[in-house]
Amino acid sequence: MPDLLTCDRHQIELSLAPIPLSAAAEFCHDDRYGAFASFVGWVRRVNVGRLVTGITYQSFQPLCRTVLTEICQEAEQVFGQELRIYVQHRLGETRVGDPTVLIGVGAIHRDEACEACRYVIEELKHRAPIWKLEHYEDGDSGWVPGNCLCQERRSRDRRGSTGPE
């Protein structure tokens, strides 16, 4: 059963079921809006030089819902209250090519939609309590280090960001 949190402006879902890619556009559609931006992430075949067969996602769901709600609220503060935001993340076992995260943002203008979408996925990757156990073709598996440890995030933060401090 999916773990679903919905209000009139955003929908957050953590689910063991496959992600229907049309769900974000359906939720974010509004006749007042002229723009929709989305991001889809899926399991890639090679990571850090190793052949990947799949990923098992785990999460502390109550905290994850809280963090994702905060991220959506921050995006509204920065990019405007006239947004609709959809966030869905897979949990459990996934295979190469499976969609694992879907972000959608509807807005009056494209700049707000695109920037808010980027903000939501970046903050999700760095703040949401979601853990990845990567499975490899050789039968081995290993936990993927948290994204907040990545050098890319530290260097991006030094250049400044569009989000709240």
Swiss-Prot record:
Q: Where is the signal peptide?
A: none
InterPro entries assigned to the protein according to its UniProt record, in alphabetical order: MoaE_sf (IPR036563), Mopterin_biosynth_MoaE (IPR003448)
Q: Which reaction does it catalyse?
A: 2 [molybdopterin-synthase sulfur-carrier protein]-C-terminal-Gly-aminoethanethioate + cyclic pyranopterin phosphate + H2O = molybdopterin + 2 [molybdopterin-synthase sulfur-carrier protein]-C-terminal Gly-Gly + 2 H(+)
EC number(s) on file: 2.8.1.12
Q: Identify the keywords attached in UniProt to this record, alphabetized.
A: Molybdenum cofactor biosynthesis, Transferase
GO MF annotation terms: molybdopterin synthase activity
Q: Which residues of this UniProt protein bind substrate? A: W42, V43, R44, H109, R110, K125, K132, L133, E134
**Which Pfam families would you find in this protein's record?**
MoaE (PF02391)
- EC main group: transferase
Q: Which cysteines are joined by disulfide bonds?
A: none
Q: In which pathway does it act?
A: Cofactor biosynthesis; molybdopterin biosynthesis
GO process annotations (BP): Mo-molybdopterin cofactor biosynthetic process
Q: Where are the transmembrane segments?
A: none
Give the protein family.
Answer: Belongs to the MoaE family.
Q: How does it assemble?
A: Heterotetramer of 2 MoaD subunits and 2 MoaE subunits. Also stable as homodimer. The enzyme changes between these two forms during catalysis.
Any idea what job this protein has?
Converts molybdopterin precursor Z into molybdopterin. This requires the incorporation of two sulfur atoms into precursor Z to generate a dithiolene group. The sulfur is provided by MoaD.
By what name is this protein known? Molybdopterin synthase catalytic subunit
Q: State the organism's lineage.
A: Bacteria, Bacillati, Cyanobacteriota, Cyanophyceae, Synechococcales
Corresponding gene?
A: moaE
